[in-house]
Amino acid sequence: MTTGQSRPATTTQKKHTHMSHEIHENDTVVLGSNKPAWHGLGTVFAGLLSPLRAYIEGVGAREMFESPVLFNGQPVDGYKIISGRYANGAHSALSVVGDSYGLLKDSRFFEILEKVYGGRAVVETAGTLRNGKRIWVLVKRDSWCVSGKDRINTFDLWVNRHDGSGCFELHRTNVRVVWQNTWNL
């Protein structure tokens, strides 16, 4: 099956209050290779999942934008608000940041991944945490066997934040990230 033909194999939608996994009502998780996460959250896709497909099918269900901070109706110099507008109509202010903070929108984030891998990236998992304040994409790299039976996978973990707490990052890991706790490993 090609990435353009992927269809959701299963979808599990659960609403949560604040939990250690940091998956909230406006967050999304997509999982490729027909492998569900052990917690049962997210949308599982059969076959390969490209960054573009992960964006369209799950993570891209929102629009990020900047707006001025207002006090008594007047803009406050040096600050702006980062907000998200979700497909379900919800709107959420994610953070107040300084003017020097550059918003890397989700659509641009996924375009960069497509270019870095020349359109050949295979997304293992992708999602948002903390109502969209954090976003990740886990791209599968190499796989090998130790002692002929223990499979080891390596991934590129791409991270972006919309809360001003960090920047666009790349990490190498052998952990399949599916929520906050596995992101922390």
PLM ranges: what are they?
Residues 2-4, 10-112:
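Feature for intrinsically disordered/low-complexity regulatory segments and propeptides
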